A protein has these predicted regions:
Chain A
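Membrane-embedded alpha-helical signal segments
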Residues: 1-328, 343-346, 466-555
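Generic detector of multi-pass transmembrane helix bundles and their immediately adjacent loops
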Residues: 332-335, 345-351, 355-530, 536
Length: 555, 405, 370
């Protein structure tokens, strides 16, 4: 009988009592007055940890106290020199004075300890959490309050050139994992009181600090509020990287196109903040997340703006071409070869037929096979350690290209086409957007294999329609091309000179529209050299003196 | 509605995707197509007619008489024998395949052709169609219908008339080019670029054939010494039947009347007063055609302005040292050109072939006259021999080359 | 509706342009030449004027009721039931228009490009594309049109520009051939039937930022699309001559075929032209499909149109498959096109007149008591 009937097993698994669960259950209880009880409670929750450091001592030689901290997180020197030492020795100005118990905390915090971050707290859960963040807690026998002092010191790597976004012209600083350094990198570029940083803690286990940065008066208030709302709705165990946040706050997670942009560069972040976007930083991740985004950001780099406008425009045009190539080139090849060879010049068409003569399967399959092998190769080279990687990638490409052709597995033109496509996809600066196009290449190839050029058009229309219907935090994805915006258009295909773009693009609905000052920019007037300039000076001097200079400001 | 809307959507989308599994209907690999590069059409001889198999009809019950059967020769490119890169020396195999079939009409012949060729025939790269003179004189309208209906055929393909049988052209092996028919096609295409022939491609042939006031013309080729092809003149048509051909120099004159800007023909002009000649080559032309009615009868005035250069003088006894002698040469050249033009127009009038397009001018500029008296193409062909014309030629010799004498 | 009113004047213009330029661009010269021979450009011009007149009536009517579409304000003007009946006519007409456009599209593709692919597949793919895109709101609708317009206009202009090299101005004369005035009038109607898509302006006006600029938008829309059509007719007539055009189904396509990019890099430009034309057809189909669904939604006061867009598709497909062959299809198109003019021009004119009468009467009634 029991073979045929499935018994429902309702056995409940016993729940493990983890310390965090214990903390969550109780709510914030105040600590008791007795030192022994306090120490016992701490040992109950954290006692198994090797790095729990409890040092009992006497304050001013009189009052029993203990310092509790997690030694792996703290700066021992600070604990010893600036906290324990002054507490154990009576300071000069207090010698001989009365130090009653009820005033002790105040005395310690304001007159004794050499630390700017000394604060008072009394909730047990709060203190434990602070300890877990690297603060040292001083328990005093007989007093409810405890003092906690920030003595955090964690090894972090130095600021280096960002690996994913390398430029030739432009700053070489990149974000690191520590959020306070990152905010510092932003703040020194924006020494204005409008730059606001709001923090929240997200993630049940990681309790990561998440910072929302924006420029008040330029960023749109609704967007900022929306960002806060979406972030506050996240309920998850761990936020290990900005990417986790991105997946929760995106408008349309099923779309292949990213609706946020992540960057490792502080100068790019600051530039976007100034346009009116909001930046989100997470402790532990060297990337900052920018919202809202539009599609044409994905082929722009900071280098475009640091260089002169002709150079920037030209390079940008090349990038756009590479982007289009990486999407449709293999499909165009397939449709020309299999469906419409009459488009090719006759001699070339006949010769291509010759190249394909030995290949045993249709052009679609051939292209798909080589594309898939290219994708695998690309993924493999990312994972290889540096020493092996360089040589292997060259060998791999040569082998696949040359040998495959000679073995009759593909025609030489296919290899050229796929190689150009792959190179083109590298030219898109944003990794996530390039990936979207890489992925979308495959459905379009299949459509091209079924319908030819018509299939390519249908696929492209489909993709464009999808992009046109996406919104990122209320901003249409294809602005400023689709809801047209004359100011924004100046930056889409070519990069107009900076003095031609006096207003911010409208799609972000910034509160403050003016980029350049109201007086005419005197940039082009600098072209007058020599006599003309002297003449100008005689007539009262140049009118624009917007940047004040002073002698003793090196900061 | 259904309990789970998502399931419904998935089911519907799967249903839609099923027809796609049946395959890519139109996909045909480029190496699996038989690219027909050139076609030659001849009249089928007696024994050839007997060779026809029953492919598009059973028995002999179609109304087209056997005597009008055509022989079609096709030159098909063989993939694999034509390499992508530079040609390896010592390629002994011919890169093209030549196939001959007979049929009652062009489409009939194509169907017969398909029976003999392994891959599916593809006409998208058809660059040139050669008609033998016999067939052209018999009438070309029967081919136009097939060529127009088929969407694969380009309007920029070339159509030419040949003196010999068209099959000979398909079997040619010129040394200048890997693929023989491409040499032929390129040559014909370049004719108008060099200035040896007015622009002509099959689309233009059809347009002119359809228009009411003009008769079509085609290049006339001949083979000299086994492998060399020569442009031997212009074949002019009455309706769709070829009625005559001009000689090569007359092509230049024809271009003058039609107003084709680019010159290319040179002629020997006798220097007045001497027994010597110089070679004067036309560089560019400008033409103005005016049509009027004189006493109710159509009259055409053509005014042509030539810009020429002297390329060569025959003997050292002529001195091209002053402008007076150039003026003399100019007047002499104008005179002889005018004569030649009048001769040509008369020649075409005899054959009732208005290749110059005078009828179009009448239709466009004198619509009342046209609507009352002419209206149709046949009527114009009757009136054409009766029209009067006068020609004025004005040559300017602008250049004499680098030699000062 | 609840959607923010964000359609700018430029967007309205581009919507009109891309809706009008559609399937009709291919057989247009054939219709014009059948009617007027060398005076085909003249016939086209008169057709454009008639269409412009119709559009202005619609725009003006819409500006008088800037918050409502024709479905709802027709109920205001001529009464609830009468308005509903006429609206049903309008909706049915656009349903048929969508299916005919899809069928014509399929016919061109199957004849000219993909000869082995079954007609049903081409039609279904296009209808599917349109119905999936119709699930969005009207702002995305205008973004889509706005985006595609330059891609549609530019290649057509380039092809026309390159082709003029072969033009023969004799074919364009005489400009006005007064032979067959009745035929020319019929041709004028056929040409203006090609502009019927502009009816959607009634749907756009309620969502425009500044509805009083609707007239300006329609003016520019007709100018650009009409100008393009005129240019195409002139170019084809000049290059092929009226007699040759009478033998070709799709003269515009032949125009693209004859044109070669200088240097002979690409030889058969008609394939590229067809690819761009797919875009133009898609925008037209999208517009008429969206209009049908949107109007249905308004007529029956449904909440949203997403499910409706899938629901209608089988009907459209069925109607598209009805004509037996291509000649039959063109007969139906001509017939329905001309009948449709009644709906798109006479009906709005009728509404406008009654609207004027009512407001005049209302003013009189207001003036009386004083």
């Amino acid at each position: 009988m029991s073979l045929f009937r499935k018994k429902k097993r309702n056995v409940k698994k016993p729940q493990l009592l983890t310390p965090s669960k214990a903390l969550e259950k109780k709510g914030d209880t105040p600590t008791s007055i007795s030192l022994m009880v306090k120490i016992k409670e701490v040992k109950e929750l954290l006692g198994n940890n090797e790095d729990l450091q409890i040092k009992e001592f006497k304050i001013f030689g009189q009052y029993p106290a203990a310092s509790v901290c997690l030694s792996s997180l703290i700066n021992q020197d600070v604990l010893n020199q600036d906290i324990l030492k002054p507490l154990m020795y009576v300071p000069e100005h207090l010698k001989g004075k009365e130090k009653p118990l009820n005033e002790l905390v105040h005395l310690i915090v304001t007159e004794t300890v050499y630390h700017s971050q000394a604060k008072v707290a009394e909730g047990k859960e709060q203190l434990i959490e602070l300890m877990l963040r690297g603060e040292s807690v001083i328990f005093i026998d007989g007093i409810k309050d405890s003092i906690h002092i920030d003595t955090r010191k964690i090894e972090k790597r130095s600021i280096a050139q960002p690996e994913t976004e390398q430029v030739i012209l432009g700053p070489r600083e990149g974000f690191i994992e520590s959020i306070s350094t990152n905010i510092a990198l932003l703040r020194y570029r924006l020494p204005t009181p409008d730059f606001q940083v709001k923090t929240m803690k997200i993630g049940r286990l990681t309790k990561s600090t998440v910072a929302i940065c924006y420029l008040k008066g330029i960023a749109n208030e609704t967007v900022v509020k929306e960002v806060e709302k979406r972030l506050s709705e996240i309920n998850i165990d761990a936020i290990l990287d900005v990417g986790y946040l991105e997946q929760f706050i995106e408008d349309n997670p099923f779309s292949p196109f990213p609706q946020t942009q992540s960057t490792e560069r502080p100068d790019k972040t600051v530039a976007n903040l100034i346009e009116g976007r909001v930046a989100i930083l997470v402790d532990g991740s060297p990337f900052s997340l920018l919202v809202p985004v539009v599609f044409n950001q994905f082929y722009q780099t900071t280098e475009d703006y640091s260089s002169r406008f002709l150079m920037g425009s030209f390079v940008r045009l090349a990038r756009i071409l590479a982007l289009v190539f990486s999407l449709v080139f293999p499909s165009l090849y397939v449709s020309l070869i299999s469906f419409n060879p009459e488009l090719l010049p006759t001699e070339f068409a006949v010769a291509v037929a010759g190249g394909r003569a030995g290949v045993p399967y249709p052009a679609v399959i051939e292209v798909l096979i080589i594309e898939v092998s290219m994708e695998i190769l690309r993924e493999a080279t990312v994972r290889l350690p540096k020493q092996v990687g360089g040589a292997l990638s060259i060998v791999g490409v040569l082998v696949i290209g040359q040998a495959a052709v000679e073995a009759g597995l593909s025609s030489p033109i296919t290899v050229v086409v796929i190689a150009l496509t792959t190179i083109g996809s590298f030219a898109t600066p944003t990794y996530t957007a390039a990936f979207a196009l890489r992925m979308l290449r495959f459905p379009i190839m299949i459509l091209a294999g079924i319908f030819g050029l018509y299939g390519v058009m249908v696929g492209v229309i489909f993709i464009f329609n999808h992009m046109l219907s996406l919104k990122s935090f209320g901003v249409p994805y294809m602005a400023p091309v689709s809801p047209e915006d004359s100011q924004g258009m100046k930056d889409v295909v070519i990069r107009s000179p900076l003095w031609w773009m006096p207003k911010r693009p409208e799609f972000l609905r910034p509160s403050n529209q003016n980029r350049l000052g109201l007086n005419d920019n005197k940039v082009l007037e600098h072209n007058k050299v020599g006599n003309d300039q002297r003449e100008d000076a005689a007539n009262g001097g140049s009118k624009g003196d917007h940047n004040y200079s002073s002698d003793n400001d090196l900061n | 509605m259904w309990q789970n809307q998502r399931e419904l959507k998935v089911a519907i989308s799967l249903l839609f995707l099923i027809p796609l599994l049946s395959g890519c209907w139109d996909s045909q690999e480029i190496e699996q197509r038989a690219n027909v590069l050139a076609l030659g059409v001849d009249k089928a001889s007696e024994e050839e007619r007997k060779k026809e198999d029953e492919i598009s009809h059973l028995g002999k019950r179609i109304p087209i008489p056997d005597e009008e059967m055509i022989k079609v020769t096709a030159q098909i490119a063989v993939p694999g024998r034509i390499p992508l890169g530079p040609q390896q020396p010592g390629g002994s195999e011919k890169p093209v395949l030549v196939v001959e079939v007979v049929g009652h009409t062009l489409e009939d012949a194509m169907l017969n052709l398909q029976q003999e060729v392994a891959d599916e025939i593809f006409l998208g790269h058809l660059r040139i169609i050669v008609l033998s003179e016999e067939i052209a004189r018999h009438g070309t309208a029967r081919f136009n219908d097939f060529l127009r209906r088929n969407p694969e055929i380009r309007r920029t393909a070339a159509l030419v008339v040949s003196k010999e049988s068209a099959a000979k052209y398909m079997n040619l092996d010129p040394e200048l080019e890997r693929i023989p028919s491409l040499y032929l096609a390129d040559m014909v295409d370049n004719l108008s670029a060099i200035g040896k022939f007015p622009p002509s491609f099959i689309g233009l042939f059809w347009t002119i054939y359809s228009s009411k006031g003009q008769d079509p013309y085609l290049p006339y080729l001949t083979v000299i010494e086994k492998t060399t092809i020569q442009l031997n003149g212009l074949a002019y048509f009455h309706g769709d039947k070829m009625v005559g051909k001009t000689n090569p120099l007359e092509i230049g004159i024809f271009m003058a009347v039609r107003g084709v800007g680019r010159g290319g023909y040179g002629a020997f002009i006798q220097v007045p007063g001497k027994d010597e000649s110089v070679l004067v080559r036309a560089v560019s032309r400008k033409t103005r055609t005016k049509v009027t009615l004189r006493n109710g009868k159509p009259h055409v005035s053509v005014k042509i302005q030539y810009e020429s250069e002297i390329d060569e003088k025959e003997s050292a006894s002529i001195e091209l040292s002053d402008s007076a002698i150039l003026k003399k040469i100019e007047t002499e050249s104008s005179k002889s050109t005018k004569k030649a033009i009048e001769k040509l127009i008369a020649k075409t009038q005899k054959s009732k072939s208005d290749i110059f397009g005078f009828g179009e001018h009448f239709r466009a500029k004198l619509p009342h006259y046209w609507n009352r008296n002419v209206k149709t193409k046949e009527k114009w062909d009757e009136i054409y021999p009766e029209i009067t014309f006068d020609v004025t030629v004005d040559s300017h010799i602008h250049r004499v080359g680098m030699k000062s004498k | 509706m609840g959607d923010p009113k964000e359609i700018t004047t430029i967007q309205a213009t581009t919507i009109l342009i891309s809706t009008i330029i559609g399937v009709g661009v291919l057989p247009l010269p054939l219709f014009a030449v059948r009617a007027g021979e060398t005076s085909a450009p003249f016939v086209t011009l008169t057709g454009i004027f008639l269409a412009a007149l119709g559009l202005f009536i619609l725009a003006y009517l819409g500006m008088r009721h800037p918050q409502k579409t024709i479905i709802t304000y027709s109920q205001d003007i001529i009464g609830k039931w009468l308005g509903r009946i006429f609206s049903i006519f309008v909706i049915c007409f656009f349903l048929v228009l969508t299916s005919l456009a899809a069928r014509e599209f399929g016919a061109v593709v199957v004849t000219g490009v993909l000869r082995e692919t079954p007609l049903e597949v081409t039609v279904i793919v296009m209808l599917l594309l349109a119905s999936i895109s119709c699930r969005n709101n009207i702002n995305v609708f205008s973004y889509i049109h706005n985006f595609y317009v330059p891609m549609i206009l530019a290649p057509v202009l380039i092809v026309v520009a390159f082709s003029l090299k072969n033009a023969n101005p004799l074919y364009l004369r005489p400009v006005f051939l007064g032979n067959d005035l009745r035929g020319m009038a019929a041709g004028m109607l056929t040409v203006s039937a090609l502009f019927q898509g502009s009816f959607i302006i009634t749907m756009i006006i309620p969502s425009m930022k500044s509805p009083n600029k609707a007239l300006k938008a329609s003016f520019w829309g007709i100018l650009i699309s009409g100008g393009l059509y005129l240019l195409i007719v002139i170019a084809t007539v000049a290059i092929f001559g009226p007699e040759e055009i009478k033998q070709i189904f799709w003269p515009t396509l032949e125009l693209a075929r004859t044109t070669a990019v200088p240097g002979n890099i690409l030889q058969r430009l008609d394939i590229i032209f067809l690819a761009v034309w797919v875009l133009a057809v898609f925008t037209t189909l999208f517009s008429s499909y969206y209009f049908t669904i949107h109007s249905l939604k308004e007529l029956f006061q449904l909440k949203d149109h997403k499910m409706l867009s899938y629901f209608i598709m089988p009907f459209v497909f069925f109607l598209a498959m009805l004509p037996q062959n291509i000649l039959h299809m063109y007969e139906i198109i001509q017939y329905i096109g001309r009948a449709g003019l009644l709906i798109t021009i006479m009906y709005p004119a009728f509404l406008l007149i009654i609207d004027f009468l009512r407001s005049w009467r209302r003013k009189k009634n207001v003036a009386k008591p004083t």
